[in-house]
């Protein structure tokens, strides 16, 4: 978890001094999975955002639309695919965990397709839940249930967050897996617990990409790769993009940071497909570092959720504006006018 940020901080810039220093960058645009974005970053998928603020993913989609950047909806959203689609005004993607197994996954894919998602993002690194010790300490489990036991275990956290408590109470402490609503398997409607069970029993494999490709008419992207051999396998499978990610360090502690993995994967995959990265992105300068190392764009995870928790939709909008402004400022100080001028020659790695 810590290495995602630590490895970003090890990178230092080598600016080009001259006539371009301080001049407004003329081109911060990027084509990401075939859609134009005014800036080289997007909102990444985060589960249970409704537990942070009642606005949840709807607020995130609205904020992304204001800036014109893509938004990726998590299967673990507290709002339905259709609710988020109605709020989105920029291209949006759907991140797939096959809740309910293959049958449930097919239903979610069909709904996302009908609602207008342009890209299907299949997360490959969650074959079993990670051992998240903090969650275990305060009794968190899936699906989220707020009762006397969980409130007691979380009391020391809640008592210092009166604004959060007020918002959650007004939302009646609803943290649902909204996209399992109405899901069926073998003709029977599934409860949330059952949908989760079948996902764990039938996690996605490389072979599943075949039927997903047959059902999905848009871009097919795999997320959660940190191994160069897996990147080659993804290319062989015919994917349209790769998201380099160690799941925020929340799955397997000793995986390399996303940035370190990007160094290995980008040279292999970026000549063929768009390569994105997430993990530790907190500043616009972090986005620029990722672009210098071959990423097409970066995804925000915790950063946008911090804004959501602090101020709902307006909080997310403010975070996106901060990231955008920092990208522009960093480019000015580096002496580049276009995203296309960013490369490894502008970076050096601290030796410690």
Residues of each region from the PLM?
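Alpha/beta catalytic cores of nucleotide-metabolism and tRNA/nucleoside-modifying enzymes
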Residues: 1, 6-9, 257-277, 282-352
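Hydrophobic faces of well-ordered beta-strands that scaffold small-molecule active sites
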Residues: 41-44, 71-73, 92-96, 120, ...
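N-terminal capping/small domains of soluble enzymes
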Residues: 1-128, 323-325, 342-351
């Amino acid at each position: 978890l810590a290495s995602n940020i630590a490895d970003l901080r090890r990178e230092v810039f080598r600016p080009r001094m001259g006539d371009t220093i301080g001049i407004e960058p003329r081109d911060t645009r990027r084509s990401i999975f075939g859609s134009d974005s005014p800036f080289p970053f997007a909102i990444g998928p985060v589960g249970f955002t409704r537990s942070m603020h009642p606005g949840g993913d709807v607020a995130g989609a609205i904020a992304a639309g204001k800036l014109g950047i893509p938004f990726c909806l998590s299967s673990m959203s507290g709002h339905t695919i259709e609710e988020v689609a109605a709020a989105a005004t920029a291209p949006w993607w759907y991140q797939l965990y096959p809740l309910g197994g293959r049958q449930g996954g097919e239903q979610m894919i069909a709904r996302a397709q009908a609602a207008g998602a342009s890209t299907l993002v299949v997360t490959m690194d969650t074959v079993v839940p990670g051992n998240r010790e903090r969650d275990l300490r305060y009794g968190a489990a899936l699906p989220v249930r707020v009762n006397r036991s969980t409130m007691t275990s979380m009391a020391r956290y809640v008592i210092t967050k009166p604004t959060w408590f007020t918002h959650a109470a007004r939302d009646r402490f609803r943290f649902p897996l909204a996209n399992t609503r109405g899901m069926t398997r073998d003709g029977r409607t599934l409860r949330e617990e059952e949908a989760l069970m079948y996902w764990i029993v039938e996690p996605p494999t490389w072979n599943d990409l075949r039927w997903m490709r047959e059902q999905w008419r848009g871009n097919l992207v795999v997320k959660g790769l940190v191994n160069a051999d897996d990147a080659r396998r993804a290319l062989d499978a015919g994917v349209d993009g790769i998201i380099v990610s160690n799941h925020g360090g929340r799955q397997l502690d000793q995986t390399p940071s996303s940035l370190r993995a990007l160094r290995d994967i980008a040279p292999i995959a970026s000549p063929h497909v768009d390569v994105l990265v997430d993990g530790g992105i907190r500043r616009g300068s972090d986005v620029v570092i990722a672009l210098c190392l071959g990423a097409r764009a970066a995804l925000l995870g915790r950063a946008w959720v911090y804004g959501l928790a602090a101020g709902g939709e307006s909080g997310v909008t403010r975070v996106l504006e901060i990231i955008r402004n920092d990208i522009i400022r960093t480019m000015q100080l580096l002496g580049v006018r276009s995203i296309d001028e960013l490369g490894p020659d502008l970076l050096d790695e601290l030796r410690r």
